[in-house]
C-alpha cells in the first residue's frame, strides 16, 4: 500500500510512534530493548525479528506485539519496508506474538487523526496468527528457554547430538544474546507479568517462575525493570 513517509533519514530502527517509518533496507539491527509496550504494523515489505517470542518473519498486513521490557534483534529485507508503531497499554497481559489485520490502511488513517482510536481499533480488529513450528535448532532452543521449567542448556544440547558450545554459538548468531542470558530475561519478564497481573504472594510467584527464592526473583525483576516487585505491587494496587 502507498503511504506518506516523513522526509528524514533513518539510520537505524529508531522508534517513531504514531506515524509510518521507513526501515533501512538489508540491515541487521543488533538486539535492543524497549521499556514501553508497542505493536508494529507492517504496511509494506517484510522483516524478521528474533526476540521474546522466538524468530518471526512478518510481511505486509501483519502485526508484531511487544510487551513491556521487550528485547529483540531485527533483520530488514532488501524490499522497501514501512511500519507503523503504536503504543500498547502498560500492563501484565500476555500479548499474541503475531497477528493479521484485514485493513492496515484504516489503522494508519485513524492514527493520523486520533492515535487513541487507532490503538483501540487495532486491538479490536487483529486476528492472532498461530506460532509456526520451530524447525531450526536455535529456534527450538528459544521455545525451550521460554518455558517455565527449562532444562540445562548442556543437557539439552547432548540429547540432540550437539555440544553446548555449538548450540550456544548458533543461538547467539541468530538472537544476538547467549542462551543463558535469554533464559534469564524471559524468566524475569514472566515473573514481572505475574507480579502485576495477580495478587499471589511474591514468594509463591518466585517459586512458580522458577527462582530458588524470593530474593533471587527480586534481583532479577529489579535489574530488568528498574523497580522491585514490592514497588510494582504498590504501583498497581
Each language-model region and where it sits:
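Aromatic/histidine-rich interaction motifs
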Residues: 93-121
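Short clusters of hydrophobic/aromatic residues that line enzyme substrate/ligand-binding pockets
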Residues: 72-74, 179, 229
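Alpha-helical residues within the helix-turn-helix
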Residues: 155-158, 169, 173, 207-208
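Conserved active-site tyrosine of GNAT-family acetyltransferases
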Residues: 61, 66, 167, 211, ...
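Terminal helix-turn-helix DNA-binding modules in bacterial transcription factors
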Residues: 173-214, 218, 224-227, 234-237
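N-terminal regulatory/effector-sensing and dimerization cores
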Residues: 2-98
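A short, Lys/Arg-enriched amphipathic alpha-helix from helix-turn-helix/homeodomain DNA-binding modules
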Residues: 116, 120-165, 177, 181-201
Amino acid at each position: 500500500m502507498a503511504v506518506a513517509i516523513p522526509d528524514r533519514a533513518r539510520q537505524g530502527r529508531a522508534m517513531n510512534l504514531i506515524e509510518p517509518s521507513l526501515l533501512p533496507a538489508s540491515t541487521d539491527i543488533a538486539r535492543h530493548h524497549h521499556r514501553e509496550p508497542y505493536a508494529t504494523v507492517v504496511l509494506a515489505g517484510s522483516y524478521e525479528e528474533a526476540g521474546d517470542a522466538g524468530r518471526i518473519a512478518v510481511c505486509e498486513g501483519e502485526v508484531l506485539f511487544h510487551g513491556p521490557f521487550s528485547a529483540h534483534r531485527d533483520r530488514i529485507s532488501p524490499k522497501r519496508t514501512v511500519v507503523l508503531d503504536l503504543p500498547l497499554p502498560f500492563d501484565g497481559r500476555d500479548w499474541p506474538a503475531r497477528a493479521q489485520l484485514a485493513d492496515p490502511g484504516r489503522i494508519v488513517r485513524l492514527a493520523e487523526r486520533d492515535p487513541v482510536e487507532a490503538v483501540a481499533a487495532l486491538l479490536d480488529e487483529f486476528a492472532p496468527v498461530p506460532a509456526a513450528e520451530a524447525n531450526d535448532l536455535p529456534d527450538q532452543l528459544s521455545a525451550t528457554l521460554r518455558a517455565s521449567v527449562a532444562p540445562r542448556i548442556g543437557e539439552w544440547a547432548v540429547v540432540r547430538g550437539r555440544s553446548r558450545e555449538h548450540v550456544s554459538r548458533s543461538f547467539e548468531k541468530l538472537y544476538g544474546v547467549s542462551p543463558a542470558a535469554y533464559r534469564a530475561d524471559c524468566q524475569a519478564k514472566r515473573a514481572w507479568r505475574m507480579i502485576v497481573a495477580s495478587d499471589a504472594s511474591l514468594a509463591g510467584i518466585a517459586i512458580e517462575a522458577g527462582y530458588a527464592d524470593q530474593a533471587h526473583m527480586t534481583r532479577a525483576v529489579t535489574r530488568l525493570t528498574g523497580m522491585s516487585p514490592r514497588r510494582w505491587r504498590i504501583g498497581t494496587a
